[in-house]
């Protein structure tokens, strides 16, 4: 099956890359603090 390798790609993507991306966006959001 072609979809048998999908969890081995999707789990690191959601578990590692998405938190790092969200933390980077949050860091840039805090640095460019133009709300206050």
Swiss-Prot record:
Membrane topology classification: Single-pass membrane protein
Major location category of this protein: plastid
Subcellular location: Plastid, Chloroplast thylakoid membrane
GO biological process, alphabetically ordered: photosynthesis
Residues spanning the membrane: 9-29
UniProt keyword annotation of Lipid metabolism present: no
Annotated Gene Ontology cellular component terms: chloroplast thylakoid membrane; photosystem I
Keyword Chloroplast (UniProt): yes
InterPro entries linked to this entry: PSI_PsaI, PSI_PsaI_sf
Key words of the record: Chloroplast, Membrane, Photosynthesis, Photosystem I, Plastid, Thylakoid, Transmembrane, Transmembrane helix
Described purpose of this protein according to its UniProt entry: May help in the organization of the PsaL subunit.
Similarity comment: Belongs to the PsaI family.
This protein's name: Photosystem I reaction center subunit VIII
Organism: Thalassiosira pseudonana
């Amino acid at each position: 099956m072609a979809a048998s390798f999908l969890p081995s790609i999707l789990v690191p993507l959601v578990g590692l890359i998405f938190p790092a991306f969200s933390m980077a966006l949050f860091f840039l959001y805090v640095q460019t603090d133009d709300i206050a």
